[in-house]
Regions:
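Bacterial N-terminal signal peptides that target proteins for export
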Residues: 1-13
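Bacterial N-terminal signal peptides
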Residues: 12-21
Length: 343
């Protein structure tokens, strides 16, 4: 081997090692940041609040105590934002923010603001509102040992498992009502991309592909929603191996609306996994194939692969299904981080 080739090889190896180190450092930095935010939040609580917010990591009752419904209809455990001081609330939201990407936390805030809009629309109905969200921690916040952060209320259930440098967001439920509202003179659609990207993918299919993707029956709600842990369903619709490269890229971009909610380090790992699975991933559609410009679709759709199930389900409760949406994000092999924490 020539001196030049040796230098090139060594340089490439050094660069690879540096890149690898930076990748690990970013992941560790993310975990360190989340643990620090968790400890800061806990330090703001009094003894009773700490007792209410902390659970054993193996507490299955608490782990699965999440719902789409308002907290007055399905009781949550933990500490409610409404019961916190301004400093405690700020620390709680800083903790949630630390575990999410910037766009992910923005989506969470917009879902909560949507519930505030619903509260006002319903005559200040006390079962709605952006302060009716609970936070809880399962296990001890740690950079090494697994633990879990939960945050949720009406139309939101984040289940975030932290295991060393790995982070898992499944199962997570996002929803919104109204799906379109105005704030500070701007139109807000918290789950608008989830609708628009799916419709764009459907419209990118040719006639043969559309016939495969569109189901012959109607689905009106989530199949794998709250209370359906461990349930399995057969893939339906159009398999991505029958798509062209552009269509598969559009499917991955759609999936990223959920995968990228978690912080960037974990999202990168997750998207790499899902990209490797893409040819074994299915896209199914049920319902109308058009939407009013600027509004969300009124059709159900599902994305399903070896390590992911995503559902989008408009709701007829409240009238216009384009204005009331439920979505579900699962990993049938790793909900609650079970693959990472199995002994």
């Amino acid at each position: 081997m020539s001196v030049l080739s040796m230098r090139t090889t060594r340089g490439g190896l050094a660069l690879a090692l540096i890149c690898s180190s930076l990748t690990i450092a970013r992941a560790q930095t993310a975990t360190t940041r989340i643990v620090s935010a968790a400890n800061t939040f806990l330090s703001t609580l009094d003894q009773k609040q700490r007792q209410n917010v902390l659970f054993a990591f193996d507490d299955e009752k608490q782990r699965t105590r999440w719902s789409n419904l308002p907290t007055s209809l399905v009781l949550r455990a933990g500490v409610n934002l409404k019961e916190m001081s301004a400093a405690q609330r700020s620390a709680a939201l800083a903790l949630v923010s630390s575990a999410l990407s910037r766009r992910g936390f923005e989506k969470v805030e917009q879902i909560m603001e949507g519930d505030e809009v619903l509260k006002i629309k319903e005559g200040n109905n006390s079962i709605f509102g952006k302060d009716l969200y609970y936070i809880s921690i399962l296990g001890k916040p740690s950079e090494k040992d697994p633990w879990m952060l939960q945050f949720g209320g009406h139309h939101l259930a984040l289940n975030i498992t932290i295991a060393g440098e790995r982070g898992v967001l499944t199962p997570t439920l996002t929803g919104v009502q109204p799906a379109l509202y105005s704030m500070d003179g701007k139109t807000v659609r918290p789950l608008g991309q989830e609708s628009d990207k799916a419709l764009a993918l459907l419209n990118a299919l040719d006639d043969t592909q559309r016939k495969q993707a569109i189901l012959s029956y109607r689905l009106a709600d989530l199949v794998l929603g709250p209370g359906q842990d461990g349930k399995t369903i057969e893939p339906e619709g159009l398999k991505a191996s029958a798509m062209n490269e552009r269509q598969r890229a559009m499917l991955l971009d759609l999936i990223s609306e959920w995968a990228d909610i978690i912080h960037e380090s974990a999202a990168t790992v997750r998207m790499t996994e899902l990209k490797a699975d893409i040819n074994e991933t299915w896209f199914a559609w049920s319902g109308p194939t058009t939407a009013t410009p600027g509004n969300s679709i009124t059709a159900y759709y599902r994305v399903q692969g070896p390590h992911v199930v995503i559902e989008y389900a408009p709701q007829r409760l409240g009238g216009d299904p384009s204005m009331h949406v439920h979505t579900m994000y699962r990993d049938p092999t790793n909900d609650y981080g079970r693959r990472l924490t199995a002994k």
